[in-house]
């Protein structure tokens, strides 16, 4: 799901070690060449630029490579795994505590009816080809994304209009109070230099320029010497794309300065490296279809589940999940309990937090008439207390979480069968069968996307659920004239004292854990304070790579 913004500073837990003897000194460049890349300019050393003190080599997973290039219209910066676009500038930015701040914008205001946003643009900003950045470029960017974006919803935008060279107006189809969050991740492109090949050869005004892209291998970014803001400390950033085991091998060989890793590697130690763990809102949870079986949608997809449609069942499951056990046994201790899709966000309602209470869960089921059978599985009116829990085939963490869930719920008298499936069938099957998902974005729209009735539909998009009061709160939040005031409405959608989607409410989703993002970091590398990472273990880590340094 598309998302925006990041939150409070991450936590770094360090573990020194003594496995292996990595070659090279702290910050040594040239990792791509050393790791077998035949490119004549792989890494800073081979390119003849940068030093051990102003360059860094970062390893990300293969899926982090932007398939369509560095074009905001095709997911760069503003796709599922949101991050700052680096090559382009944005109108706004977010601070470590999720406050909105300005980048290209110098001021903004919204009309009383919420249908017009007026943004003033800073003077003196130029694209890397020397042409000035004006409000015309801003309007062009947003209108282009409205018409062509393949990954984001811009239906709320009617039109962007350049009033003059340094003022742009956004005319909205409907009030959208969280528009500043969208402005924080949309990179501005030059109208004069934009075309079909833009993603391969981007021109921007951001902190970095694309110097080289060896597809399937690496991206090399070079600091923009004419950047209008504070000059980047890291003059060259090399991003290598590797599978998890290859990333660890690169660390063992001393060929990476910072490399992503998984909790399964968390109990290892590597000489010359620290293990950093950053908190996230990268959550895992599963949907529980909230209507009875027997109906279909307009495409004939079966809807509903005769077991999970009982709200007492959903509440009992929420109480019966030992999240701390999952963190220790599945995540090796690297995670936090998840109670909602937006833990720790300014719009998070703490009423979502639940204490592990299997006894109360059992009482709820008893009182609701779910009787324990001789086989240890409950039953009511001929319906067995059972369901299949799907997970994305090939995702070992989701599989382990699903199996742990099944084991825990068995003690409650619920029989859960786990099944790995492909995404080609998951979306349709999830309308009647629980599916373990990964979510987490820096925008309240994540709540809307999960719980609000789909436009023109009868139920929410990803799992059949409907609550008119919840919908109303979210509609009012979007229509609010104040971003801060909207937070309270988002909280009420979660729980207002009588209804909502949390503990004592409808519980159409069960949230399990927020997964820490882990990285091997070469000793001496000072990674700047991290915002709370969103879903995805990729480009978010380098949101502020320009502020990193070497000791």
Describe the function of each predicted region.
Residues 225-269, 415-417:
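Ligand-site clamp/hinge motif
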Residues 134-141, 165-169, 206-207, 235-236, ...:
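Alpha-helical secondary-structure segments
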């Amino acid at each position: 799901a598309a998302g925006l913004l990041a939150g409070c500073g991450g936590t770094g837990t360090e573990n020194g070690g003594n496995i292996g003897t990595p070659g090279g000194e702290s910050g040594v460049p040239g990792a791509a060449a050393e790791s077998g890349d035949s490119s004549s300019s792989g890494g800073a050393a081979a390119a003849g630029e940068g030093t051990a003190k102003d360059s860094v080599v970062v390893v990300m997973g293969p899926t982090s490579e932007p398939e369509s290039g560095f074009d905001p219209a095709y997911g760069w910066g503003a796709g599922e795994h949101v991050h700052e676009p680096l090559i382009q500038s944005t109108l706004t930015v977010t601070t470590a505590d999720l406050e909105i701040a300005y980048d290209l914008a110098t001021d903004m205001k919204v009309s009383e009816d919420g249908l017009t946003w007026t943004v003033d643009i800073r003077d003196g900003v130029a694209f890397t080809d020397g042409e000035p950045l004006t409000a015309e470029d801003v309007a062009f960017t947003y209108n282009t994304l409205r018409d062509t974006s393949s990954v984001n919803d811009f239906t709320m935008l009617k039109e962007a209009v350049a009033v003059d060279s340094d003022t742009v107006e956004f005319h909205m189809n409907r009030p959208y109070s969280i528009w500043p969050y969208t402005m924080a991740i949309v990179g501005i492109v030059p109208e004069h230099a934009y075309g079909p090949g833009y993603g391969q050869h981007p021109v921007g005004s951001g902190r970095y320029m694309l110097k080289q892209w060896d597809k399937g291998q690496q991206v090399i970014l070079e600091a923009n010497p004419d950047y209008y803001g504070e000059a980047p400390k890291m003059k060259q950033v090399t991003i290598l794309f590797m599978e998890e085991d290859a990333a660890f091998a690169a660390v063992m060989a001393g060929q990476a300065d910072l490399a992503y890793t998984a909790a399964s590697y968390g109990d290892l130690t590597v000489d010359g490296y620290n293990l950093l763990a950053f908190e996230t809102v990268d959550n895992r949870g599963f949907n529980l279809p909230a209507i009875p079986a027997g109906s279909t949608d307009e495409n004939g997809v079966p809807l509903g589940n005769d077991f999970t449609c009982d709200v007492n069942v959903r509440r009992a499951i929420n109480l019966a999940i030992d999240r701390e056990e999952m963190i220790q046994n599945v995540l090796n201790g690297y995670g936090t309990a998840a109670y909602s899709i937006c833990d720790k966000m300014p719009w998070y309602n703490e009423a979502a937090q639940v204490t592990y209470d299997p006894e109360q869960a059992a009482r709820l089921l008893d009182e609701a008439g779910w009787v324990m059978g001789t086989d240890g599985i409950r039953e009511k009116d001929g319906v067995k207390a059972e369901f299949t829990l799907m997970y994305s085939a090939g995702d070992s963490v989701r599989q382990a979480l699903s199996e742990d869930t099944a084991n825990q719920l068995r003690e409650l008298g619920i029989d859960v069968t786990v099944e790995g499936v492909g995404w080609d069938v998951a979306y349709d099957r999830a309308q009647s069968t629980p599916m373990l998902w990964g979510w987490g974005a820096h925008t309240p729209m994540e709540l809307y996307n999960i719980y609000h009735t789909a436009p023109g539909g009868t139920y929410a998009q990803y799992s059949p659920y409907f609550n008119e009061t919840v919908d109303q709160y979210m509609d009012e939040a979007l229509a609010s004239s104040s971003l801060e005031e909207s937070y309270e409405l988002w909280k009420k959608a979660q729980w207002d004292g009588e209804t909502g989607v949390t503990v004592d409410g409808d519980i159409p989703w069960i949230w399990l854990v927020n997964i820490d993002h882990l990285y091997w970091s070469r000793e001496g590398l000072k990674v700047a304070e991290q915002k709370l990472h969103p879903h995805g273990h990729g480009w978010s880590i380098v949101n502020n790579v320009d502020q990193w340094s070497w000791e």
